[in-house]
């Protein structure tokens, strides 16, 4: 079998472009260089901030960031995304690398994400992209839709005593004696029940605008935190409408008062109780609100299908925040491509 040459690669890439490589649209629409200063301030050591071109240079930070975006877009592990970049010309091109260039390995990518996670930088990069969305004309419009979805992590097989110690914020003594076991235990994830099913992991609380279905703010907590507990952190004055849409989990007299005091208009579903069923007017109001509120479910559905699922395989809430934040960013990037395609039609 002959070796793939430069012109062979160029011909294959041209054929991919002719077929419609979706990564080319993403590459064109994302302002990659606008992220550089913040990323390099976190990931480069003083020795890597070189004043000359002598010696071996570190891997470009934007190449690694592009690789994280690829990973989130396709729900790949570190090892899988390394393999796919080596194997697929479209992935290599997305990184702006040639067939002769070295590809970051899985360990390098893991270390890069660790630095971003510990610095809390993913949230800032998400906000920077939101500024780019507004600059392109996609300001938050039509009201704020709030909701939360469970993000599972691999189940922990702990004894009852171990679970009680973790809930109390303690580390079981047996784990101290087995450092390898301790490293594999997620002490931040929690169990919760939804629709009669038990889940272990975290929650992705989001605020999406009703007009564009773009995520504008998000918060990551353990799965046991009630949806309504993060409402204050999610709401923003940046939407052109004062309407706030949410399911009945966000309904309480206290929340209604807070919304009014902050100048928001509650469009939160009214909940029926055992003693008080909904009036016809309340049921009609809920139906009308559902026509808009249901759009936030499209966000989670897209993350589940187009982005390959929501499960994360990290340990600890710091890493979970980074992975979930990257998933939210990847959703907004893909959504921008869709909005631009609709606008051009």
Model-derived regions, located:
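Polybasic low-complexity intrinsically disordered regions
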Residues: 56, 79, 83-86, 95-100, ...
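Charged, often Cys/His-bearing segments associated with DNA-binding zinc-finger transcription factors
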Residues: 1-44, 338-345
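Secondary-structure capping and boundary motifs in well-ordered enzyme cores
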Residues: 31, 55-63, 101-105, 288-292, ...
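Basic, short loop/linker segments at the boundary and entry of helix-turn-helix/winged-helix-like folds
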Residues: 24-69, 73, 103
